[in-house]
Amino acid sequence: MRSAAVLALLLCAGQVIALPVNSPMNKGDTEVMKCIVEVISDTLSKPSPMPVSKECFETLRGDERILSILRHQNLLKELQDLALQGAKERTHQQKKHSSYEDELSEVLEKPNDQAEPKEVTEEVSSKDAAEKRDDFKEVEKSDEDSDGDRPQASPGLGPGPKVEEDNQAPGEEEEAPSNAHPLASLPSPKYPGPQAKEDSEGPSQGPASREKGLSAEQGRQTEREEEEEKWEEAEAREKAVPEEESPPTAAFKPPPSLGNKETQRAAPGWPEDGAGKMGAEEAKPPEGKGEWAHSRQEEEEMARAPQVLFRGGKSGEPEQEEQLSKEWEDAKRWSKMDQLAKELTAEKRLEGEEEEEEDPDRSMRLSFRARGYGFRGPGLQLRRGWRPNSREDSVEAGLPLQVRGYPEEKKEEEGSANRRPEDQELESLSAIEAELEKVAHQLEELRRG
């Protein structure tokens, strides 16, 4: 009996141990499970929905595990959205980068394309400038050679001392018409001759007439050289003739000025009546006329050269024609500037002489200056040697040097030696002014061009 009772107790104790004990945590979980079952059944039974109780909603909203599950689900959605957005942004950035690279390549290509023609134009412009400078130097050299050779012919031409003795007879009234005659045959700087007109009309002609101006200038230079050789031969002959005729007393005398020369030329056949005047004028050696004819011949040759170029230059290429025409225009421009500078210096020197007309020794100073320094053109020498406004100076210039005597010549030479530094300073100042005017004209031409 006792054993049976013990077994029964053991069985009861085992059953009691095997039965679950309901704790508060288990109660909450069971309620949550029931609410989840209700929600699932509600979603599955859509045609005939089973409403979820309010208690289940409250338990589900209060349970942290369900909230974490829902948050986790939302995070997954957000991550997916972020992934899609990142992919879109990457594609957009790639497109932008590619477009930016294309723009950079285009921008880099454009300056290279623009730099190449700029370099080409700079090279062409530098070559053109060098050629223009060379042409201008050649033109200046030719002008200086022609201007330097012509004035040398005038001092060499002159009668001997016998003619000077005969010059004492004519009076003041007869000097004015005789000396005014050679001045009328000379070209004045204010009224340009046909050469200046052709230079002014040259740019208006067609480009074909200008295409080979440099070759024409070279031809002119050769012609000028030949003419200069002829002039030198004629000068040597003319110098030899008066040396043979003149006595040895002419060795110590200074060469007479141009005003003296003009009076000497007019003196030998001068009686006091009007017919004698005409004969004296006809008996003058035509030095001024010969120079004028020589300049006229040069102008005619220069006028013929563009016509020949216009006839024979039509077969050239258009680019060469344009280039040669530009060079021809530039050469003409530089030559005009040189002529203007020379004219300005000549006018300034003449103004300085007019201010110093009151000095009685001016004619002798001019003779010494003409001998010692040598001016550029024949026109300047004639103007400095002859001044029709001052009769006293012209009378003193016309008197022979033998009458004045040797001591007077010594005094005049000493005075001229004292005045030479002043004359040198004046000439240097005038040369500086001429250079400054040339530079100013060049700057104006460059600004206009």
Curated annotation (Swiss-Prot):
Residues where Phosphotyrosine is found: Y191
Signal peptide: 1-18
Cystine pairings recorded for this chain: C35-C56
Region described as Disordered: 87-431
Bias (Basic and acidic residues) ranges: 107-140, 233-242, 279-297, 323-351, 406-423
UniProt-recorded name of the protein: Chromogranin-A
Keyword Phosphoprotein on entry: yes
Family affiliation: Belongs to the chromogranin/secretogranin protein family.
A UniProt-annotated Pfam family: Granin
Keyword tags: Amidation, Antibiotic, Antimicrobial, Calcium, Cleavage on pair of basic residues, Cytoplasmic vesicle, Disulfide bond, Fungicide, Glycoprotein, Oxidation, Phosphoprotein, Proteoglycan, Secreted, Signal
